Amino acid sequence: MDKLVIEGGVSLNGPIRVSGSKNAALPILLACILPEGPICLSNVPRLRDIHTTLKLLDILGCETSFDGNTVCSEVKDLKIEAPYDLVKTMRASVLCLGPLLALKGEAKVALPGGCAIGARPVDLHLTAFEQMGATFDLDSGYIHGKCDKLKGAHINFDFPTVGGTENVLMAAAIAEGETIIENAAREPEVVDLAKFLIACGAKISGHGTSIITIQGVPSLKGCDYKIMPDRIEAGTYMVAAAMTDGELLIQDCPFQELESVVYKLRKMGVSLEEEEGGVRVRRANGLISGVDITTQPYPGFPTDMQAQLMTLMCLSNGAGTIEEKIFENRFMHVQELVRMGANIKLKGRTAMIRGVEKMTGAPVMASDLRASASLVVAGLAAHGRTDVQRIYHLDRGYEKLEDKLSAVGARVWREQE
């Protein structure tokens, strides 16, 4: 098993390019089931979850290729079953449910590993499809759905679920009649999926707002499409620049989609300026201030940037709080940061952070994707050596991270444990 070794205390300086968004690429890849004819997607990040999704597409009857950062896919003989050995490693694979029901009238998709219905919003997906005419059985860990022909419906989500919105968006594109999604997720990745479907011939309006309207069409056609840049990767580099008191020019930065993060970083004393070629990030006056943050669905502050901002607050001149309102158990990184010298107290879903003068390198263990990113950022600024274990989490969401960081001055490399 690999670990990441970081010799901290070095400022990061220079240009750093943001890869394509994994969270946009995954639903768009699964939407490749829908159109007739070939599809070419560019700016696709080379990540483990992407490779898993391509395996799933192959099993479902697509012909796929992955050359550089371009994926080409075409449906040849569509099957209806997504097996457990693939789905267990990646929750996003439940997004093939909508396209399969819409095209084949039947889908058999394994429940993601450890995911009981009700514990995560898989039930929101199923309730929506039931409104569109599908019926479901839960059989030996599989969701087995059937329908004659999905029909448009008025769907009002209890919570603006990203996956639920994406699943219904795909199915409704070729369902019979009009579908209206109220309390729809507004995330940029949902908007990117809608733009892809529109490029394939779908009739969608309202994407990016809380009410999306879809007029079903008989069929979709293939197209060429470029995946949006990864806003969370870009946000992570913003924090890394401020954390190490360096200056980064972040290229291919989706600046408008990071408005809530940029607002908080500026309040903390970080300068972020758009210019030709990217966004230049550095400390405004040398000091970092604490702020109060509450995670919310988009356009609120993203839960996926919570751990990184907490890490920056650890070196602030003052104190701040973070209230996590999206996920439970999203503070797994706190004890690891404390091992590096951070002053953090937890009370329920709120973390109270008081800044310290310096952090010290230590062996730490990543518990999830964003926690691992926060530990890498902490290691970049810490005095001495930090070993980040379990970086397979990191490999799920960051393309060539150590190569990109090394190119802007970081002393970071991969070792086998």
From Swiss-Prot:
E.C. code: 2.5.1.7
Binding-site residues, UDP-N-acetyl-alpha-D-glucosamine: 91, 120-124, 304, 326
GO MF terms held by the record: UDP-N-acetylglucosamine 1-carboxyvinyltransferase activity
Coiled-coil regions listed: none
Sequence positions bearing 2-(S-cysteinyl)pyruvic acid O-phosphothioketal: 115
Keywords per UniProt: Cell cycle, Cell division, Cell shape, Cell wall biogenesis/degradation, Cytoplasm, Peptidoglycan synthesis, Pyruvate, Transferase
Keyword Cell division carried by entry: yes
Reaction equation(s) it catalyzes: phosphoenolpyruvate + UDP-N-acetyl-alpha-D-glucosamine = UDP-N-acetyl-3-O-(1-carboxyvinyl)-alpha-D-glucosamine + phosphate
Biological process according to GO: cell division; cell wall organization; peptidoglycan biosynthetic process; regulation of cell shape; UDP-N-acetylgalactosamine biosynthetic process
Gene Ontology CC annotation, any one: cytoplasm
Record-listed phosphoenolpyruvate binding positions: 22-23
Subcellular location: Cytoplasm
Enzyme class: transferase
CDD domains xref list: UdpNAET
UniProt xrefs under PANTHER family: UDP-N-ACETYLGLUCOSAMINE 1-CARBOXYVINYLTRANSFERASE (PTHR43783:SF1)
Function: Cell wall formation. Adds enolpyruvyl to UDP-N-acetylglucosamine.
NCBIfam families associated with the record: murA, PRK09369.1
Family designation: Belongs to the EPSP synthase family. MurA subfamily.
Protein name: UDP-N-acetylglucosamine 1-carboxyvinyltransferase
Organism classification: Bacteria, Pseudomonadati, Thermodesulfobacteriota, Desulfovibrionia, Desulfovibrionales
